[in-house]
Amino acid sequence: MKIIQYKNYVFSFLGKQNPLNNNSSQFLNCAFGKGDSNFRVRSNRKLVSKLFNNKKIIFVNQIHSSRIFFYDKTRPYDIKADGIITKNKNVLLGILTADCAPVILLGKEYFGILHVGWRGLLNNIILNAVNFFIKRGE
């Protein structure tokens, strides 16, 4: 696990290894539908939350698109998107990557994270996110 701090923001890049358990057979899979039970994935996500003062983690169901979800205070179930933007400093934003790239966006008030694959890149997910920030004076 790698943790980076920039100003008031903290970023973490998690691998499969569980930072709370040195047992090499304990993986920290946070993705549903990738081999672990839903119970195990939820437990792993709770462990990650625990590492960051039990803040709520906002995930979206990634669909390799250019869709971006704006999180304010409520999250409808099963949001399909590849980006999350918020100004709520009391939550964590989470995305999952393998061969796609994570892109982190920081403004004065808003912050976001994108899951960028070739489809999203081709369909301007980064440009859409940057325009969101610009329209809000970020």
Positions of predicted regions on the chain:
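Conserved nucleotide-ligand handling architecture
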Residues: 1-23, 51
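A residue-level signal for beta-strand positions that form part of recognition/binding surfaces
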Residues: 8-11, 27, 57, 92
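Surface-exposed, charge/polar-rich loops and edge strands
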Residues: 9, 22, 90, 99-100, ...
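Short acidic/glycine-rich loops and adjacent helix/strand connectors
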Residues: 18, 35, 43, 128
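Short, glycine/acidic-enriched capping/hinge loops at junctions between secondary-structure elements
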Residues: 23-28, 70-72
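Contiguous C-terminal substrate-recognition/catalytic subdomains in enzyme active sites
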Residues: 26-36, 40
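Phosphate-centric recognition/catalysis
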Residues: 38, 42-119
